[in-house]
Amino acid sequence: GLINNTAVLNSTASTNSNGVTVTVFAGETATLPAETMSPGALANYTTTVSCDAGTLTGTNGQSAGNTLAITAAATATSPITCTYTNTPKTATLQLAKAWGANSSASDSASIGATTGGTNNTTLFSTAGGTAANSGAAVAITVGNTITFPAETGTNIGNYNTVLSCLAGGGATANTLSGTNGQVSNTLVIGAGDSGKAIVCTYTN
């Protein structure tokens, strides 16, 4: 432990904050606390802890028990600064359009831009029976609430439109608010979606 310990430090995203400096001595070992978050969800972030001097045993800032050995050489750095860096977890999003058998080529479907993402897909349209997608996948952030627009187009009322989403080929962390693609629906991007390609398909 330390003869002198730092106080609790609170910080609001996205504001960098510094605690009050305390005096430490060569030969001491500091136990670094696990970061907590309230309000908010710590699971939506990766937290990396780093120190500019001394010997650090671990870098996961969400884990308890990381220690910093204050070596004689480390005392040449004053103050020794340990930084917790939070990086939002991300995924990607692409929309797709599929048609069932007996779809008419004279019909069409238009799917507007999503909203609520760090980045959003753009409007695209396609003729009946022709598969399409929104183009290159866009990067979104865990915690985003994505709003999917209602599908529109020629003779859309003649079809049932089902909206479904997959993350990396499996289930998304959270469920869609609804599956009727002819009305607006939402999906909250969860921590379990981190690093995955999310594809949401409107099927007529």
What label would you give each PLM region?
Residues 1, 34-35, 45, 84, ...:
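Extracellular/surface recognition and adhesion modules
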Residues 15, 23-27, 63, 75-77, ...:
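Surface-exposed coil/turn segments at beta-strand junctions on protein surfaces, enriched
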Residues 18-22, 66-68, 80-82, 133-138, ...:
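Short strand-edge motifs at loop-to-beta-strand transitions and within beta-strands
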Residues 70-91, 97, 187-204:
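Conserved "repeat-terminator" motif of extracellular CCP/Sushi domains
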